Amino acid sequence: MNICEAMGMSISHFESILKMTQRELKEHLVQQLRTHDYEPVCKSGFLYAEGTVPVLLVAHLDTVHTHRPDIICCSEDGRYLMSPYGIGGDDRAGVYMILMLMRECHCHILFCEDEELGGVGARKFTNSKLRPDVNYIVELDRRGRNDAVFYHCDNPDFTEFVCSFGFKENSGSFSDISVVAPHLKTAAVNISAGYFNEHRPHEMIDTYAMCENIRRLTAMFRQNTCHFPYKERVHARGSMFGEQSSLFAPMVERPSRAATCKLLMPLPEETRLYMGQHQIGSAPEYRMDRSGNLYMYLERLNAAVEAEGVFACDAGGHPPVFSAVCEGTRFLQVYTYEEAVEKLEQAKNAS
């Protein structure tokens, strides 16, 4: 059994989506959303559905191809799809991936029209009164199998979160989240949807790549996270080539990152903790990030605060080694000391 069969992918349903016009697809998606307990909002330029998982999924309904792909060729093992007219995987693959994802995760969903014309539908969405309250945004509109494209969003903690699921950061020019993310002030990423050679007649879709990324994203969406804010990538203005340059970007002060999320690993039970020459605390009370920084875990807040001046080692004096796959490793809200004290006081007064 291949991964698509194991995940219940319907090739016939996917092929029908590939053959629909943008208008037909929008009508079809309204029915699909209602079937899965959504109440879709259908407007000129976009289709939105509020979910219960604080993640916004985005894909676009149009393709650049002018001919309906009535002839679809499939490889013998069922993995690859092509059409002599251009199959339109950009972005029907992303649309179908969202339909599969919503079976397991009731995320917020946004389908945009006319992305290929410059994000027309996305701009109409940002001009509407809709403003979903989500922790981050995932678009499924990227070529390849393993890419994560953040465009002008520069939130290192969000990048680390996404890449901890095996995706690799890459660059890109534009997609609907380039418009939606800064509007919602929320970090966003464009993930590979398994298509290749987009905008060409010999475009190809790798259904195995689609299903593998559905599997990874399902695991991602089941992680409890805080809100990842949108942070604009900093560039110095001016260049001899007439473009913005990042040459002096390190000299520009970045926004404060006091309240953020970090991937933190529990320390092994045998770990010894020291402040100066004095042994302190116990390992279960502390967490470590991938840079080796230590944090005290605050169970009352289900959060952490950086433990300045504390270092950890085993009986032989060796520091613990960070592992993203270690049991108990997860993203936690990290507060400054002052924020932690304030929130503990609030929790005490509320009880």
Question: Residue locations for each model-derived region?
Answer:
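A short, charged, amphipathic alpha-helix used as a generic interaction element across diverse proteins
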Residues: 340-348
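Acidic, low-complexity, intrinsically disordered interaction modules
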Residues: 281-335
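His/Asp/Glu-rich mid-to-C-terminal helical/loop segments that flank catalytic regions of hydrolases
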Residues: 197-262
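Acidic/histidine-rich catalytic neighborhood of metal-dependent amide-processing enzymes
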Residues: 64, 85-162, 167-169
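Short secondary-structure junctions
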Residues: 35-42, 75-76, 166-169, 282-283, ...
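Zn-dependent metallopeptidase/amidohydrolase metal-coordination segment
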Residues: 168-213
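Catalytic-core environment of secreted peptidases
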Residues: 48-89
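A non-catalytic alpha/beta surface segment that caps or lines the substrate-entry region
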Residues: 7, 11-53
